[in-house]
């Protein structure tokens, strides 16, 4: 085992020849003692011994596995002595940079110290004797108090002042060097402009380097100005902060003003003040709007329609505000299109088209011009049962007139609470239309007129209407497998009253879900009746009306049309199910017979959809099915899935044309084939992205015949080799210097940012303390005022 630290130290000193006998004659002259040849290396040997014995100064990183890294251009093991030395050197550099930054920060903005202004101190071209001689001469000239009266090198003005106006002259001319200089200047003042060449007149164009130097100089100048202004502002802030304490002391020392005593007014004066205050808020008379011309009214109407159309397009694209939907948002949704009522003959579409673009002028023609209140003779119903009871005493042809009279009597401007009554009445009208639709023989004219009135009223009163519609949606959901005539009329009314092209709607969206669920619930089996198929076709026609503007694809429609066609066309078992979504084709009683088929153009009535099955109803539904196929071609023509849709529809249409001879069907088949061929040509299959082929780079290997790993250059010219060596050294030193400069600048920038953060934090903390102190004083004064007020009030 090794001895103690003292024994190890003595052994190391003796081994290096620093202690013990040193005059022993050694036969081996290679290892000589320091006293003989290495006396100058004594300090180096001692420093190495100290490093070996000061083990706590070295940092050793223990690693699980041996890892090497490049340190100083060499491979160094991580955690070894070389790596620790490099890490220590790096930390020493950072510490020195930090100390230098702190020193510069302390000396920033300070003046003082000794400046050596002796002559020639920084001039290396002068010898020591020349410097001393020049200094002695200047010292003698400065200490000499006696001045020469006539100095040839002095100015005339100074001579006149110093010599009482006497000037050294010769032949009447002053002997001074300034005159000669002036003469030389005056001689060169005049010149011949024609003798100058154009090249001499034109200024020299600056090089790019000169321009960049000028830009950098200006940038530094402006940056220095900004720093000076910022420093000046900081000094002013510090001065204000120093004076703030004195200001607050003065404020606190000032006695608080006594609050004014409460005025003791008489009851008459208080009443008079209240009357004056009431008159202040009275509404003053304003000039009435002038009567507008017909052109101006038409222009306003067109502007309103354009705004409603723009809002409809925005809602169709799903551009909504980031707020919750409200019932009042339905105000702008009543701009339903008249084209959305096409399809089954349940009402008079021509009258609806004429009334949809109108306004409430026809309703207001019978109104009096004044604002006098009428005597309420007609009672507005509160429930649907009361409304039916009131209509029982009125002739059926006058039901619409009775409704108009109720609306005219209970206008919101006539009495308070009429708006709430009208909201309830609109919901009653909606229920009444559905009630009429359930009659065995519904009055079509009354239903159409009532729907027109309801459309106009729904623009102003829609709160209760939305609640009634949601209740109706829940009722239809419960009887989804056994629909009633009122349910089909409800689907039509929603498309008539609301805008169905919106991306999301409070009423239309739940109705769409309900309609899709209804047609999806119709099964493809032998138990399905013709009436159920007709109800599904009716709902599909309404769905297509809903999507006239938005043209959204609905997969439930395609699936149901395939099932309906297979249940109606004759001999469906002869079809192949390759292009159909149905796996097994069945034959049902609902299929048309192969004999006695006569195409018809008659429309289907709603009452027929809830009657008995017949051959005539099957023919009408087949004709309606062909019309729906044609509408799908026009609505979904630009859809990407149209090729797959047409592949199934074209097979069904071709099979139907064998037994159902109709010009409409033949035109449909021809149109389907053209559209399908065009879409197939336009469709491009997905392909990978094509890139230009890049060849593999090849290089011819270069071999040196006289290769030597110790040689760094194979240049024969010795001078050029030395020059290249110097250039490489300069380049290496330049890169190293730039690296150090960048490192130092980054370190300085980090330190400056940290100082600014500390300064800002200190400033904000100080301002927060000031604000808190002011708030405390204000709160105390407020509490004092409240206590005084309460004390006087209790007296």
Swiss-Prot record:
GO biological process annotations for this chain's record? Answer: maturation of SSU-rRNA; ribosomal small subunit biogenesis
Q: Map out region (Disordered) in residue numbers.
A: 20-42, 147-209, 281-310, 349-370
Q: What is its main location?
A: nucleus
**A Pfam family annotated for this UniProt entry:** Nop14
**The entry's keywords:** Nucleus, Ribosome biogenesis, rRNA processing
Domain of life (superkingdom): Eukaryota
Q: Where is the composition biased (Acidic residues)?
A: 154-164, 349-363
GO cellular-component term (any)? small-subunit processome
Q: Where is the composition biased (Basic and acidic residues)?
A: 33-42, 182-192
**Annotated coiled-coil segments of the chain:** none
Q: Where in the cell is it found?
A: Nucleus, Nucleolus
Q: Name one GO molecular function term.
A: snoRNA binding
According to the record's subunit comment, the protein's assembly and interactions are: Component of the ribosomal small subunit (SSU) processome.
Concerning its family, UniProt says: Belongs to the NOP14 family.
The record's PANTHER family line, in alphabetical order, gives: NOP14 (PTHR23183), NUCLEOLAR PROTEIN 14 (PTHR23183:SF0)
Give the protein's biological function: Involved in nucleolar processing of pre-18S ribosomal RNA. Has a role in the nuclear export of 40S pre-ribosomal subunit to the cytoplasm.
**Under what name is this protein listed?**
Probable nucleolar complex protein 14
Supply the gene name: NOP14
């Amino acid at each position: 085992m090794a001895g103690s630290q003292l024994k190890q130290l003595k052994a190391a000193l003796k081994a290096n020849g620093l202690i013990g006998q040193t005059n022993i004659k050694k036969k081996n002259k290679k290892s000589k003692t320091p006293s003989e040849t290495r006396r100058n290396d004594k300090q180096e040997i001692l420093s190495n011994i100290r490093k070996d014995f000061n083990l706590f100064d070295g940092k050793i990183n223990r690693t699980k596995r041996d890892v090497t890294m490049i340190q100083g251009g060499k491979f160094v093991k991580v955690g070894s002595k070389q790596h620790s030395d490099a890490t220590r050197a790096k930390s020493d550099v950072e510490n020195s940079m930090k100390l230098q930054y702190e020193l510069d920060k302390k000396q920033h903005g300070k003046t003082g110290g000794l400046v050596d202004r002796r002559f020639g101190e920084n001039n290396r071209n002068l010898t020591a004797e020349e410097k001393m001689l020049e200094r002695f001469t200047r010292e003698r000239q400065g200490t000499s108090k006696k001045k020469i009266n006539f100095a040839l090198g002095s100015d005339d003005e100074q001579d006149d002042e110093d010599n009482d106006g006497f000037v050294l002259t010769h032949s009447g001319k002053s002997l001074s060097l300034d005159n000669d200089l002036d003469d030389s200047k005056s001689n060169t003042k005049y010149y011949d402009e024609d003798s100058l060449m154009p090249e001499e007149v034109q200024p020299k164009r600056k090089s790019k380097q000169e321009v960049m130097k000028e830009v950098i100089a200006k940038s530094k100048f402006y940056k220095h100005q900004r720093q000076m202004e910022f420093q000046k502002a900081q000094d002013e802030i510090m001065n204000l902060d120093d004076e703030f304490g004195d200001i607050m002391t003065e404020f606190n020392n000032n006695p608080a003003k006594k609050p004014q005593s409460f005025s003791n007014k008489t009851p008459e004066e208080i009443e008079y003040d209240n009357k004056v205050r009431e008159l202040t808020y009275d509404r003053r008379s304003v000039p009435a709007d002038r009567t507008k011309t017909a052109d101006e009214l038409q222009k306003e109407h067109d502007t309103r329609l354009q705004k409603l159309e723009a809002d409809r397009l925005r809602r169709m694209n799903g551009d909504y505000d980031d707020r919750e939907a409200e019932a009042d948002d339905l105000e702008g949704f009543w701009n339903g299109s008249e084209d959305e009522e096409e399809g089954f003959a349940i009402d008079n579409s021509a009258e609806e088209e004429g009334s949809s673009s109108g306004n409430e002028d026809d309703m207001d023609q019978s109104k009096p011009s004044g604002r006098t209140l009428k005597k309420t003779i007609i009672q507005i119903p509160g429930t649907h049962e009361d409304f039916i009871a009131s209509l029982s005493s009125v002739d059926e042809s006058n039901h619409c007139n009775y409704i108009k009279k109720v609306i005219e009597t209970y206008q919101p401007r006539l009495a308070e609470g009429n708006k709430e009554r009208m909201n309830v009445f609109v919901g009653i009208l909606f229920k009444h239309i559905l009630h009429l639709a359930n009659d065995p023989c519904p009055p079509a004219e009354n239903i159409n007129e009532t729907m027109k009135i309801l459309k106009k009223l729904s623009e102003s009163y829609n709160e209760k209407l939305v609640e009634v519609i949601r209740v109706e949606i829940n009722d239809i959901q419960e009887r989804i497998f056994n629909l009633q005539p009122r349910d089909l009329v409800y689907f039509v009314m929603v498309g008539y009253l609301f805008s169905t092209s919106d991306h999301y709607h409070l009423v239309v969206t739940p109705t769409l879900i309900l309609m899709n669920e209804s047609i999806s619930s119709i099964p493809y089996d032998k138990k399905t009746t013709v009436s159920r198929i007709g109800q599904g076709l009716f709902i599909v026609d309404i769905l297509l009306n809903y999507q006239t503007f938005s043209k959204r694809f609905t997969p439930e429609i395609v699936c149901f049309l395939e099932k309906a066609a297979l249940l109606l066309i004759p001999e469906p078992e002869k079809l192949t199910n390759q292009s159909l979504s149905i796996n097994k084709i069945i034959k049902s009683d609902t299929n048309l017979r192969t004999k006695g088929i006569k195409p018809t153009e008659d429309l289907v009535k709603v009452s027929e959809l809830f009657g008995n099955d017949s051959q005539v109803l099957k023919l009408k539904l087949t004709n309606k099915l062909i019309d729906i196929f044609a509408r799908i071609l026009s609505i979904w023509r630009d859809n990407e899935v149209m090729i797959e849709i047409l592949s199934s529809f074209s097979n069904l249409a071709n099979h139907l044309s064998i037994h159902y001879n109709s010009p409409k069907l033949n035109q449909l088949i021809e149109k389907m084939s053209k559209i399908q061929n065009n879409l197939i040509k336009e469709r491009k299959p997905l392909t990978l992205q094509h890139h230009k082929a890049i060849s593999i780079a090849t290089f011819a290997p270069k071999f040196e015949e006289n290769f030597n790993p110790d040689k760094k250059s194979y240049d024969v010219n010795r001078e050029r080799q030395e020059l290249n060596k110097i250039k490489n050294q300069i380049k290496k030193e330049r890169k190293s210097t730039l690296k150090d400069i960048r490192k130092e600048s980054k370190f300085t920038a980090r330190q400056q940012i940290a100082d600014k953060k500390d300064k800002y934090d200190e400033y904000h903390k100080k301002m927060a303390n000031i604000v808190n102190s002011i708030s405390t004083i204000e709160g105390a004064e407020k509490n004092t005022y409240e206590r005084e007020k309460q004390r006087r009030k209790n007296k």
